[in-house]
Amino acid sequence: MKILHVTQGYTPAIGGTELLIQRVSEELVQQFGDDVTVFTTNCFNGEGFFNPKLPRLQPGNEEINGVKVRRFPVNSRISQMVRFPQKVAYRLNLPFNEYLRTISGGPIIPGLKKAIQEFPADIIAASSFPLLHMYAALNGARNSRKPCVLHGGIHPDDDWAFQRSRIYRAIAQSTYYLSNTKYEADYVIQQGVSPERVVVVGVGVDPEPFEQTSSTQAKKHFGFEEQPVVGFIGQFGGHKGVDTLLQAMTLVWEIFPDVQLLLAGAKTMFAQKVENIIHQLPEVYKKQIKLYYNFSNEEKPLLFSAVDVFAYPSGFESFGIAFLEAWAASKPVIGCRAGAIPWVIDEGKDGLLVDYKNQQMLAEAIIEFLKNSSWAKTLGEVGRQKVLSRYTWSKVAQKFREVYLEAIKQHGIQN
């Protein structure tokens, strides 16, 4: 099968969707011998879509682990120009505001639709909304009469990003839609998409590297003592709850003053706010915090193995792949009662849930794990078993492939 994946970023770009498409693409090549090509941008993250000053990857073609990758240059200046007008239009709920939001978010990629339309694929699959390349993939597929599968990564609680009627019109025109959780699937169906064309596939993780890394080895690598470590490992963004975690830790340190805090993620614009919050903390607390920016995928087993409690108090996620990575390292997790997260974490069985932006509840959950380390380890091990049974990349890639084959079949019947 000749597959074209269209996505906003690809390794060494960092992000959940970036990793998902990378690992699914590699598994399709290695497991099934499929011919997989990825069309993507030359940006390291989504901020590059509207900020022309950020560093870029080299545009052009390369091959990574058997996957052919073509990086297209992004025109950031147009998106940058409408960043302020779209904020005003959104605030005033003007009728054209969702189009301005789409343009401001980008990525604007000259020539992408034409390249998709001309590419000799059996199937075209694109990830993720609300970004512009999704429409290029759909229109390119329709113009070349090819089946199109859309993978949205929708988290409905993000009104700015996902309260856009054009997203659901596009999904209705696709051959199949892939969702990360049943929560997302139900929401898309509520927007009028036919249930028989919505499939839950989930996301995955490679458990083996996490098995081979000891906690002692990982803590030593990052310069931690043997005291417990609370960790956040993921994208630094406004909705991810890093600021809430820092506020919660001031309460934790009143009871457990020796606990260390690891904050690891890509150095985004929000990282400056995180640094400002840390700067305002008392010196005794600052010494307990380690910031670790722009880590590679290869470092993840070390990062997750170094923590004793994984706190990821994000306000909305389409899944939250970081929970799987923590479980792969047998760590207990804390998430928020928001979006798809309660469909991922079984509360009291493999993790705990708290209210979004509630620093008191988050602190109490962290303290509960620190006071009951044997119980915390039990929850982490239950999470690991869940990963092994349902969320390996091998299993997830098989689900993607089954949908691709069915999409090709259905498209043939319809034509």
Please name every model-derived segment.
Residues 4, 224-240, 246-249, 262-264:
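Conserved donor-binding/catalytic core segment of Leloir-type glycosyltransferases
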Residues 44-45, 205, 233, 260-275:
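Glycosyltransferase donor-sugar binding loop
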Residues 52-58, 211-224:
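A short helix/loop element that forms part of the nucleotide-sugar donor recognition site in Leloir-type
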Residues 273-295:
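Nucleotide-activated donor-binding/catalytic signature segment of Leloir-type glycosyltransferases, i.e.
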Residues 294-295, 302-307:
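Short alpha-helical donor nucleotide-sugar binding micro-motif in glycosyltransferases
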Residues 315:
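Aromatic "clamp/platform" in nucleotide-sugar-dependent glycosyltransferases that forms part
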Residues 332-335, 345:
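Short hydrophobic beta-strand element within catalytic cores of glycosyltransferases
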Residues 350, 361, 368, 375-390, ...:
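A short, well-ordered alpha-helix in the C-terminal region of glycosyltransferases
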